[in-house]
């Protein structure tokens, strides 16, 4: 199953090193947007940004956003659905 170009990452436990491989896969699949909601959402968003930049020799542009604890998964999905133009398309929710 192909990954959607927009992801809402629902963090259940905070950052874990396994996220690095997931983000690498999203880059290969040309995911354009990741919204993070849940535990450590801000930290996870920063880590995703760092992974996209890498060593700077071949950065990948991905729009990221985090949602604080007052926002739900449904709020994150709603925001992702509003994105248009190059960011239009289906939203996939990934629990991590």
Stretch-by-stretch model annotation:
Residues 1-96:
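ATP-dependent carboxylate-amine ligase
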